[in-house]
Amino acid sequence: DGRVIHADQETDHLPALNDVVIARSGFSRIISFRIMVNGKLLDVYEADGIIISTPTGSTGYNLSAGGPVVNPKANVILVTPICPHSLQSNSLVLSQDDEIDIYIENVRESQLEEAYVTFDGQVARKLQPGDVLQVRRSKKIARIIKVKGDSFYRILRIKVGGQNEEE
């Protein structure tokens, strides 16, 4: 679940099965993020955006941004920066029970022009400096139908690896 906090008030509370993404729009400047995990500073990023992904979403935007592919049975949350302005910004793998708070900040005294948060690429909300995105494990459980005989790794090989089904 993702919650947007603006001026100490919750403005949105939306679920996401795959990912929650904060990204700049168009030609806006990079965004500064202060990321807290369980109330402790994890890191500060200057980047085009940040992806918070579930294992189910790890083969989508997260993978394209250089994040790891994770088995859907893993109980983790992925944090992947998008085009970070840094020499050492890797994806991080956190526990599914970790509470993630992302603070949107100005970069080097410049004004953030436009940034948005999207939930599974469907619903978008505009963000401003000072806003906080809270990401928590949802209490809702999604039941996913699995075709018998297909393993995660076989499907991964076919869809992401570009191999045909006979291999």
Report each predicted region and the residues it spans:
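Catalytic phosphate-donor-binding core of small-molecule kinases
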Residues: 1-51, 59-167
